[in-house]
Structures are given as C-alpha cells and as structure tokens.
C-alpha cells in the first residue's frame, strides 16, 4: 500500500540530522502518542539518548498518564525475545531496576500524584518507603538505605530538597520556587512601616477567640 510513497519517506528520513534520526529510533522503542514524539524531536536539549526516563518524567509533569516509568521499562531493559537483535545498549539501556534514572522517574511521578491530595511536600522517609514497597512487591529488589540523600546530586536535577542543608523532605521545583518567591515578598513587606495603622489590638483580639487556651503553650504561640 505504501510502496509508492517509500521514496518520499526515504528522502525525508535522509534529510534529517543525525540527532533527529537517533531520537526517532529511540522513540520508536516505546508506545507513545504523536504529541509526545513531536515534543522530543523538537526538544534537542533533552538527552533522551542517554536517559530515556526523561520521557516519563516529562509526561508526569504534563499529566500524560498513558506514559509511565513502566512504559519506558519495556523499551529500556534488554529483552531479546521482544527486541531481537535490536536490544538497547549503554548508555541508553537500563542496567537494573535500581537504575537511578528509573528511580528518579518514579519519584517525580509520585510527587505529581500526591498533588491531587493537596500535598506539595513529601518527607524523604515517606518517599523512600514508597520506593521500597515498589521494589519489594513488584521488582523483588532491596532499595539501598538513604538513596535519595546519597544520590542527591543526580536526583535534585528534577526536584528540590527542603531545607537545603540537612533536608528532610523533597518538593517539585515549581512549587519550591513559588514558595520561595512568596516568602521573599512577605519578608520584604514585613520590613516596611505600616502607612495607616488600623489601631487594632491584635493580641487582645486573638486572646478573646473562643479557641484560645491560655494554659496551652502552642495556643499562646499561635
């Protein structure tokens, strides 16, 4: 059916840059929608040739649920029974289920998933417990202890650690930057003198609230 069009396709293929051709070959390993393919053909800055899990990270960021870390697994792990002679090779291929590129993709997916519950911050312990459960139940592997901290330099490309020193939680970059901006604005406003004081005695008003408990230290601080 397509024989008459093959010369046109061949000329089009040969006219592409080597980078675009390599990207197309890489993307053909996965079951992807056309809009995802088009994005990664155009986005030459995204190094999917070395890290195919950037595809699932981007899809999580854009709430494209049809493409997950598991989708990328199918094309990144060598499987001659499916891929024949075209098995993936390093640096593209996933070396193990504990491949840090794969783990980072799982973390990013989880961070976007919990947004529906109103959570923008997840403790490092909670996230490692989540990964540990996945490894144990689905992949039969043992997650190295403190992996989010020991591999921080690689992971923080995609999300931030909070606080920066001695972190206890992780957060998507866009939400971390948003909160940093708001903190900066509020700090600057707090430094300014009030032009028109209201004259209200806020302490007395707070203490008159029915929920105020003078015997409770936390209530006093609030």
Regions flagged by a language model, labelled:
Residues 1-222:
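Helicase P-loop NTPase motor core of nucleic-acid translocases
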């Amino acid at each position: 059916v397509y024989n008459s069009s093959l010369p046109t396709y061949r000329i089009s293929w040969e006219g592409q840059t080597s980078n675009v051709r390599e990207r197309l070959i890489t993307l053909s390993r996965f079951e992807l929608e056309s809009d995802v393919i088009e994005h990664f053909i155009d986005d030459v800055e995204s190094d999917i040739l070395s890290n195919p899990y950037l595809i699932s990270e981007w899809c999580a960021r854009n709430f494209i649920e049809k493409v997950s870390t598991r989708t990328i697994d199918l094309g990144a792990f060598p499987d001659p029974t499916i891929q024949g002679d075209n098995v993936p090779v390093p640096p593209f291929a996933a070396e193990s289920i504990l491949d840090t590129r794969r783990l980072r993709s799982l973390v990013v997916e989880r961070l976007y998933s919990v947004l529906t519950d109103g959570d923008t911050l997840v403790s490092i312990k909670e996230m490692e417990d989540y990964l540990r459960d996945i490894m144990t139940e689905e992949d039969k592997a043992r997650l190295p202890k403190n992996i989010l901290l020991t591999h921080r330099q690689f992971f923080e490309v995609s999300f931030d650690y909070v606080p920066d020193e001695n972190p206890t939680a992780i957060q998507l970059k866009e939400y971390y930057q948003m909160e940093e901006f708001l903190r900066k604005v509020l700090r600057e406003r707090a430094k300014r003198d009030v032009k028109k004081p209201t004259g209200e005695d806020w302490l007395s008003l707070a203490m008159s609230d029915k929920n105020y408990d003078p015997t409770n230290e936390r209530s006093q601080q609030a």
